[in-house]
């Protein structure tokens, strides 16, 4: 019985909480990303998007190069 009361209290506290502190910024983001300013869409978010893009490309290219190196190393016979 006690577990039922606890679960009801948890459900009530999560379901009835107000979200007035969060404002809807979808319209602002739509204006930003739909603006015709000759920027690629992955860079329209600002400087942090640029850093994230460069980091992602660096890790991708580094991983590809390392994978090719390991495949090349494994394809040649080794001395015993």
UniProtKB/Swiss-Prot annotation:
The keyword Methyltransferase does not apply. The chain crosses the membrane at residues 47-75. It is found in: Mitochondrion inner membrane. The keyword GTP-binding does not apply. Disruption phenotype: Mice are viable but show reduced cytochrome c oxidase activity and develop dilated cardiomyopathy and impaired skeletal muscle function. The cardiac myopathy appears at 6 weeks of age; it however improves and stabilizes by 6 months of age, due to incorporation of Cox7a2 paralog into the cardiac cytochrome c oxidase holoenzyme. Defects in skeletal muscles are characterized by reduced muscle bioenergetics and hindlimb capillarity. Pfam families: COX7a (PF02238). One of its GO terms (molecular function) is oxidoreductase activity. It comes from the Eukaryota. PANTHER family: CYTOCHROME C OXIDASE POLYPEPTIDE 7A, CYTOCHROME C OXIDASE SUBUNIT 7A1, MITOCHONDRIAL. Component of the complex IV (CIV, cytochrome c oxidase), a multisubunit enzyme composed of 14 subunits. The complex is composed of a catalytic core of 3 subunits MT-CO1, MT-CO2 and MT-CO3, encoded in the mitochondrial DNA, and 11 supernumerary subunits COX4I, COX5A, COX5B, COX6A, COX6B, COX6C, COX7A, COX7B, COX7C, COX8 and NDUFA4, which are encoded in the nuclear genome. This is Cytochrome c oxidase subunit 7A1, mitochondrial. It comes from Mus musculus (Mouse). The gene is Cox7a1.
């Amino acid at each position: 019985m006690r577990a039922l009361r606890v679960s009801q209290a948890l459900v009530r506290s999560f379901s009835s909480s107000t979200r007035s502190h969060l404002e809807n910024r979808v319209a602002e983001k739509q204006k930003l990303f739909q603006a015709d300013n000759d920027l690629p869409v992955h860079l329209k978010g600002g400087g942090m998007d640029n850093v994230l893009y460069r980091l992602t490309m660096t890790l991708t290219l580094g991983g590809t190069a390392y994978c090719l190196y390991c495949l090349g190393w494994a394809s040649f016979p080794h001395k015993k």
